[in-house]
């Protein structure tokens, strides 16, 4: 079965919901929905033609083929033998215009299995201990290549160390008689560099706490440097990605925490599901978002040492980094200590 990405347009409106996209053209949902529907109707195979997804996946595969990110991996499950993606030219209309289209595919798949651990701790809340705020940071990097150690100080030492500092701050607060109302899960996820696998496993297959009791996710990934694209202007900034996409409450709590405690410039330039850089889909918060959990990805930007041995600790900018960690702590506290659970949009 061949299907087109998105949904039909009718007089410049979406076919199902008019001005708004439906789930059938939502990048977080459409592939699974269309695959499941095709399977239920007896389809043996599915080919999806989608220009937008081509741009997204072609970047991913070019990066993988460069050798900097390693080979693609996926979780071992019943769908592991599926193609993840089949790339055609972006101009796929030529394929669809031929009523007698035929093509042949030959492929060989070399499958290897490995295991890796997520590492978690739970800080119990005082009044609503069965509701959870999850903090995430990936603990892996790209290892040793051609004898060079890839240190990963920013990617993602900055996120893992931030989480440990925040965990210590919660523990100290409890010692002083201050415990937030909800519980906090500190989750170091594995295999982010191999395709967000640790967070996918947690969110989709084996969560420690119920997904429907998880009120928000705050994700820390590459937050210790400065983006050269910003020039030499204010270094006391952080990119905030996803804060208002699922919950305006989450967005407002983050703004308030920043105003009171961190005084950072909150830069929302990448807070767009259609941004060509696709940062919204490229870190571990994404697997929480697709499960309808409001999430923020805190990020300071890509730099010249990204996935190189030169990503070392002395290049971390500790003053803005400290402010970013402070912002995340107070946002987590604000989420956990509210009288009411934050609302979805």
Predicted regions and their residues:
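Short helix-loop-beta-strand segments that form the rim/entrance of peptidase-like active sites
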Residues: 168-195, 220
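Active-site metal-coordination/substrate-binding segment of hydrolases
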Residues: 1-2, 15-26, 134-172
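Soluble metallo-hydrolase cores and metallopeptidase-like ectodomains found primarily
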Residues: 72-152, 168, 172-176
């Amino acid at each position: 079965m061949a299907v087109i990405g998105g949904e039909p347009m009718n007089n410049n409106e979406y076919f199902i919901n008019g001005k708004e996209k439906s789930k059938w053209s939502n990048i977080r949902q459409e592939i699974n929905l269309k695959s499941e529907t095709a399977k239920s109707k007896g389809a043996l195979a599915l080919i999806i033609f989608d220009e937008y997804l081509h741009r997204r996946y072609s970047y991913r595969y070019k990066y993988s083929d460069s050798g900097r990110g390693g080979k693609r991996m996926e979780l071992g499950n019943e769908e592991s033998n599926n193609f993840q993606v089949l790339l055609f030219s972006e101009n796929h209309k030529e394929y669809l215009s031929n009523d007698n289209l035929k093509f042949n595919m030959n492929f060989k798949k070399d499958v290897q299995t490995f295991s890796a651990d997520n590492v978690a701790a739970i800080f119990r809340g005082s009044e609503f201990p069965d509701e959870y705020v999850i903090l995430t940071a990936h603990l892996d990097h790209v290892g040793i290549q051609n004898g060079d150690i890839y240190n990963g100080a920013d990617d993602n030492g900055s996120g893992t160390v931030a989480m440990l500092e925040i965990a210590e701050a919660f523990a100290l607060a409890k010692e002083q008689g201050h415990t937030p109302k909800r519980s906090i899960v500190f989750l170091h996820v594995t295999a982010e560099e191999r395709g967000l696998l640790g967070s996918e496993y947690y969110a989709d297959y084996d969560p420690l706490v119920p997904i429907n009791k998880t009120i928000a996710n705050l994700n820390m990934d590459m937050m210790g440097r400065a983006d050269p694209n910003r020039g030499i202007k204010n270094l006391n900034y952080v990119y905030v990605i996803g804060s208002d996409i699922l919950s305006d409450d989450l967005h407002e709590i983050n703004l308030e925490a920043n105003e009171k405690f961190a005084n950072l410039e909150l830069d929302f330039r990448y807070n767009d599901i259609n941004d060509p850089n696709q940062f919204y889909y490229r870190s571990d918060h994404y697997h929480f978002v697709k499960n309808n959990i409001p999430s923020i990805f805190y990020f300071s930007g890509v730099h010249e040492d990204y996935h190189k041995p030169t990503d070392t600790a002395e290049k971390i900018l500790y003053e803005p980094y400290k402010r970013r960690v402070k912002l995340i702590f107070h946002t987590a506290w604000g989420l956990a200590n509210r009288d009411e659970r934050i609302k979805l949009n």
